[in-house]
Amino acid sequence: MKLLYLFLAILLVIEEPVISGKRYILRCMGNSGICRASCKRNEQPYLYCKNYQSCCLQSYMRISISGKEENTDWSYEKQWPKLP
């Protein structure tokens, strides 16, 4: 009987407490977006998350398809090609 009480005491100590109302936020696109069933007004859906919800990104986020960091310096000289 003492062994049963010891087991229950250990089980209660090890188990994490359950907090109602808090949900785990599933992030996507390298922690830039949030997985949601429907995106907010200022967000754009992009691809899908593991749980088949939309990956919602802020409208100002730029997406790099190549996977490498790009230079985002948008000066006037870099917008147009130089003419000979």
Curated annotation (Swiss-Prot):
GO terms for biological process: antifungal innate immune response; defense response to Gram-negative bacterium; defense response to Gram-positive bacterium. Keywords: Antibiotic, Antimicrobial, Defensin, Disulfide bond, Secreted, Signal. One of its GO terms (molecular function) is lipopolysaccharide binding. It comes from the Eukaryota. One of its GO terms (cellular component) is extracellular region. The keyword Signal applies. Disulfide bonds join 28-55, 35-49, 39-56. Residues 1-21 form the signal peptide. Its main location: secreted. The keyword Glycosyltransferase does not apply. It is found in: Secreted. Has antibacterial activity. Belongs to the beta-defensin family. This is Beta-defensin 119.
